[in-house]
C-alpha cells in the first residue's frame, strides 16, 4: 500500500487532484499565532516554551515579532502547517479510497433515504401519484421513474453494477437521464409481433444485472411466447384434470409445412405472438385454412389452431397479490371477438372454481404475483380456458383505481422484503487460520499449499504492507530523513528481542537477517518499552503522526481473520509514519 501511495504522491498529475486552495495555502505567508491568555498556572510553562528553540520552519523573523496580545483573537486563521496537512490528509484519503485500500465513507443520510423504482408502462397511468408519500421500512422514500420499453436502454456488468438510460418526451421536452433502479415494475408487453416490438434484450439485461421485479424477470421472458405458456397450462390440465381445469384443445404448428388439414371446422388460427385480438383468424373450411397456411409461410413463425367456441360470454379471473376479482364480458355488436366492437363488462362473484384456476396458473414459472386467466363460456354451458396473462394485463372494470393501489401495496411489500434481506455491506470473513499463542511454531509446508491459491491475508492479491503476522516483515529502505532518537531505538530493540518469541521465517523471498527482523518486529512496541528521552519530538514526526491519525483504516479493510491484529496494525501505522516523514521532510 505504501508503494502505491509513494507512486501516487510523486506523480506529476497529483497536483490536479489536490483540493481547492491547496497551493494557495502553501504560498500564503504564515500568520502569527496569538499566545494563550496568561494564567496563574501557566507562567512557568510559558517561560519554558519561550526558552525552547522552535523548529526552523516555525521560527518567525525577529523583526516581525509583535507584542504579545492580552487575549486571543476570536477566530484565528489556521497555520500553514495545519492547512497543509489537512489538505494533504483529505487528498490522500480520496486517493486511497479510490484505490480500494480503505473503506469508502458511508453514503449520507439524504442519499440513503430514497429507493428508485422503475415502472415500465405507458404514460397514460401516472404511477408516481400512486407511490407518493409511501415509504419502505418507515425510512426510505420511493422515487418513481416511469418509461416505456422503447424509451429505455441499459448496460450491466458481471460484477453486479448496472445503469439504466432513459430518454422520454415530456410536454414536448426530451428528458435524458441515467439512474440505478432498485426495483422494477413491468406493466408492458416485452414482445409483440403485431407492432414489431421486441424488448426481450432489455429483460435479459435486467436479469443480468440481478434486478428484482414484479413479476419475476424469468416469468416475463417466458411469457414472450404464448405456446410456451400454453404448454404450462397443459401440465396443469394433466395434474388437475378436465373437470377442475377445463383447458381448450389446441394444435401447435412450428411452421406452415404441417398445416395441411384439420378434422373439424370452424377453427380459430392464431399466428405468432400478438395481443388484443391481433393475428387471430376464424377459418370456416379447408380452403380458407390453406390460405391461412400461405400467410403463415410469409410471417416465418409458428401458429396454433383451436376449435371455435360459440361463446355466450367471456370470463376473466384476475389475481393481484391476495386479491381476486372475476369479470364477465358480453358482446353487444355480435362480433365473435368480444374485445371488438361494443361489449358489456360486469363484475361477478368469485367462486371456488375460478379461484382454483387462477391459483393453479399463478404457480407457473416460479410464481406470478399478478396474473389473470381468460376463458369463454359457451352456449353449451361449458367453460373453456384458453389463455393466461401476466403482470402486463390491462386493468378493466370500475375498480381500476383500487387495482392500481393493490399493485402499489404489492410492490412496497416486495421491496420491504428485499430490503430486509439485504446483507451487510462488508461482512467479516470466517476465521480460516489461527495464529499459535505459545510454543514452537510449525514451519509451513510449501509443498502442500497450492501456489495459485491466495492466502486469507497477505496474499499476492493484497497491496504491499499487509503481510500476515506469521511472516517476518522485511525492513524498508527509507531515504535519509528524521528518525527516532538512537537511545529509544536501541532500548526498544533490546527489550523486544528479549520478550518477543522468535518467529520462523517465511518463504525465501521474505527471509532477512535476525537483527533486521527483531528491529522490524520490535519497533511497534517502542513507545511502551522505553519512551523517548527528548522532551520534544521532531516536528516532522508530529506531522506524520497527525497524518496517521487522520486515516480511518478499519479492521474490515485490513487484517481480516487475524488472530494478532494489534501487532499487524501497529506495524502498518509505523510504516505509514516513517514513509510520510521521509516523503515530506525538508
UniProtKB/Swiss-Prot annotation:
Q: Where is this region: A?
A: 1-29
Residue ranges, annotated region (E): 538-586
Q: Which InterPro entries match?
A: ATP_grasp_subdomain_1, PreATP-grasp_dom_sf, Synapsin, Synapsin_ATP-bd_dom, Synapsin_CS, Synapsin_P_site, Synapsin_pre-ATP-grasp_dom
A GO-annotated cellular component: synapse
Cite the post-translational modification comment: Phosphorylation at Ser-426 by MAPK1/ERK2 and/or MAPK3/ERK1 may play a role in noradrenaline secretion by sympathetic neurons. Phosphorylation at Ser-10 dissociates synapsins from synaptic vesicles.
| A single GO molecular function term of this UniProt record | ATP binding
Which stretches does the entry tag as region H? 459-537
Q: Region (B): which ranges?
A: 33-113
| Biased composition regions of type Pro residues, renumbered to the chain | 61-77, 529-538
Annotated positions of the Phosphoserine modification: 10, 426
Q: What is known of its domains?
A: The A region binds phospholipids with a preference for negatively charged species.
Relate the protein's function as given in its record: Neuronal phosphoprotein that coats synaptic vesicles, binds to the cytoskeleton, and is believed to function in the regulation of neurotransmitter release. May play a role in noradrenaline secretion by sympathetic neurons.
Q: Which family does it belong to?
A: Belongs to the synapsin family.
Quaternary context: Can form oligomers with SYN1. Interacts with CAPON.
Q: What is this protein called?
A: Synapsin-2
Which organism encodes this protein?
Rattus norvegicus (Rat)
Amino acid at each position: 500500500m505504501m508503494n502505491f501511495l509513494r507512486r501516487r504522491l510523486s506523480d506529476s498529475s497529483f497536483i490536479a487532484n489536490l483540493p481547492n486552495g491547496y497551493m494557495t495555502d502553501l504560498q500564503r505567508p504564515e500568520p502569527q499565532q496569538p499566545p494563550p491568555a496568561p494564567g496563574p498556572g501557566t507562567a512557568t510553562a510559558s517561560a519554558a516554551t519561550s526558552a525552547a528553540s522552535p523548529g526552523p520552519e516555525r521560527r518567525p523573523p525577529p523583526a516581525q515579532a509583535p507584542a504579545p496580545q492580552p487575549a486571543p483573537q476570536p477566530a484565528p486563521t489556521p497555520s500553514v502547517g495545519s492547512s497543509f496537512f489537512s489538505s494533504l490528509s483529505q487528498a490522500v484519503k480520496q486517493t486511497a479510497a479510490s484505490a480500494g485500500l480503505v473503506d469508502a465513507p458511508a453514503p449520507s443520510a439524504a442519499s440513503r433515504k430514497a429507493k428508485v423504482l422503475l415502472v415500465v408502462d405507458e404514460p397514460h397511468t401516472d404511477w408516481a401519484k400512486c407511490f407518493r408519500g409511501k415509504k419502505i421500512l418507515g425510512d426510505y422514500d420511493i422515487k418513481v421513474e416511469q418509461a416505456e420499453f422503447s424509451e429505455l436502454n441499459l448496460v450491466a456488468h458481471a460484477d453486479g453494477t448496472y445503469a439504466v438510460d432513459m430518454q422520454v418526451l415530456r410536454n414536448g421536452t426530451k428528458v435524458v437521464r441515467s439512474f440505478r433502479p432498485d426495483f422494477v415494475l413491468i406493466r408492458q408487453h416485452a414482445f409483440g409481433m403485431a407492432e414489431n416490438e421486441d424488448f426481450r434484450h432489455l429483460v435479459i439485461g435486467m436479469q443480468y444485472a440481478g434486478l428484482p421485479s414484479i413479476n419475476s424477470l424469468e416469468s416475463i421472458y417466458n411469457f414472450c411466447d404464448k405456446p410456451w405458456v400454453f404448454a404450462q397450462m397443459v401440465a396443469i390440465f394433466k395434474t388437475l384434470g378436465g373437470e377442475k381445469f377445463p383447458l381448450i384443445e389446441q394444435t401447435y404448428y412450428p411452421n406452415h409445412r404441417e398445416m395441411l388439414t384439420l378434422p373439424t371446422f370452424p377453427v380459430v388460427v392464431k399466428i405468432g405472438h400478438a395481443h388484443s385480438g391481433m393475428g387471430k383468424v376464424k377459418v370456416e373450411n379447408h380452403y380458407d385454412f390453406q390460405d391461412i397456411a400461405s400467410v403463415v409461410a410469409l410471417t416465418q413463425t409458428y401458429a396454433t389452431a383451436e376449435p371455435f367456441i360459440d361463446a355466450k360470454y367471456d370470463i376473466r379471473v384476475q389475481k393481484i397479490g391476495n386479491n381476486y376479482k372475476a369479470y364477465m364480458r358480453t358482446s353487444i355488436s355480435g362480433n365473435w371477438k368480444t374485445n371488438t366492437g361494443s361489449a358489456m363488462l360486469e363484475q361477478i362473484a368469485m367462486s371456488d372454481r375460478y379461484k382454483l384456476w387462477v391459483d393453479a396458473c399463478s404457480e407457473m414459472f416460479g410464481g406470478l404475483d399478478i396474473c389473470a386467466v381468460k376463458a369463454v363460456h359457451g352456449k353449451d354451458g361449458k367453460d373453456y380456458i384458453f389463455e393466461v396473462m401476466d403482470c402486463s394485463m390491462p386493468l378493466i372494470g370500475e375498480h381500476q383505481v383500487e387495482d392500481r393501489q393493490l399493485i402499489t401495496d404489492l410492490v412496497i411489500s416486495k421491496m420491504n422484503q428485499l430490503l430486509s434481506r439485504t446483507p451487510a455491506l462488508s461482512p467479516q470473513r470466517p476465521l480460516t487460520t489461527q495464529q499459535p499463542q505459545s510454543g514452537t511454531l510449525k514451519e509451513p509446508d510449501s509443498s502442500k499449499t497450492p501456489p495459485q491459491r491466495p492466502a486469507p491475508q497477505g496474499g499476492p492479491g493484497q497491496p504491499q504492507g499487509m503481510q500476515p503476522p506469521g511472516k517476518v516483515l522485511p525492513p524498508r529502505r527509507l531515504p535519509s530523513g528524521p528518525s527516532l532518537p538512537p537511545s529509544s531505538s536501541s532500548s526498544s530493540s533490546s527489550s523486544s528481542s528479549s520478550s518477543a518469541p522468535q518467529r520462523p521465517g517465511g518463504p525465501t523471498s521474505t527471509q532477512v537477517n535476525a537483527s533486521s527482523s527483531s528491529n522490524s518486529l520490535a519497533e511497534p512496541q517502542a513507545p511502551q518499552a522505553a519512551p523517548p528521552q527528548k522532551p520534544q519530538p521532531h516536528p516532522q514526526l508530529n506531522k506524520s503522526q497527525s497524518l496517521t491519525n487522520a486515516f480511518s483504516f478499519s479492521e474490515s479493510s485490513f487484517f481480516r481473520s487475524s488472530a494478532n491484529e494489534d501487532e499487524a496494525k501497529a506495524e502498518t501505522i509505523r510504516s505509514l509514519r516513517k514513509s510520510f516523514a521521509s516523503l515530506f521532510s525538508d
